[in-house]
Amino acid sequence: MLGQLKTEQKSNEITAIPLLLELLELKGCIVTVDAMGCQTAVAAQIIKQEADYVLSLKGNQGLLHEEVTDYFAWAERINFKDLEYDYCATLEKDHGRIEGRRCWVTEDTEWFTEKAAWAGLRSFIMVEAEREVLGQAPSVERRYFISSLAADAKQALRAVRGHWQVENSLHWVLDVAFREDACRTRTGHAPENLATLRHIAVNLLKQERSCKLGVKSKRLKAVMPQLCAEEWRNIISASKVWSG
């Protein structure tokens, strides 16, 4: 977690994302944003800061998601014949689970009538994830993205997977190790302050590599010396009272 910004009561993530981006040094980076942040203002801000973007598409962007979905469906029907595109595939097997991913990237964007509204738009991306778990029916999911990157399928897939891993890992750690969802603090700036402290703690704990422990166990280890010291103080205090 590099930064966060509290949204106003009558605002939302859409208006907050460009403001948050301004706080970060992004030059030369690839910025991935979920579907809510797939906005022309967000794309423009990222390009302004000399970075690249991979923005997730869903139905919240009018016809954009439908148009990109239809484009890739058509491209598949003609087997991408005469189209400029790049493709890669990965396969991972682990403990009764098989995960395959395929990625197509094309720079064929001239057909998109709203291209000028999206700063730096250079490519469309389709990622297919197929998962087989022992004893369960296979599942297939396709996701679509717009990007300022050139047609490099391996690079695009790394960016997309990195986004999923960070998002899933961070949310899981905050919920399981820090019990964020159970927190009922609602007064004043307390929720924002506590969230900031949690994110700082997560960053510090993940940088601690002297022991092979999970974040939750690292938290416990970090406070153990303090707990022991407190326990000894109590013992000493009790002994003084007893001797007195």
Spans of features found by a protein language model:
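Electropositive, glycine- and tryptophan-enriched low-complexity nucleic-acid-binding patches
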Residues: M1-C29
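Short, well-ordered alpha-helical microsegments
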Residues: I14, Q39-A43
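Short, conserved catalytic/metal-binding motifs centered on acidic residues
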Residues: I17, I30-C38, Y53, F145, ...
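An anionic, glycine-rich sequence signature occurring as long contiguous blocks
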Residues: K58-G162
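Short, surface-exposed basic-aromatic patches at helix termini and helix-loop junctions that form
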Residues: A43-A51, A73
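A short, flexible helix-boundary coil/loop motif
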Residues: K81, V173-G244
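Acidic, metal-coordinating catalytic cores used for nucleic-acid/nucleotide bond scission
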Residues: T32-T40, K58-L63
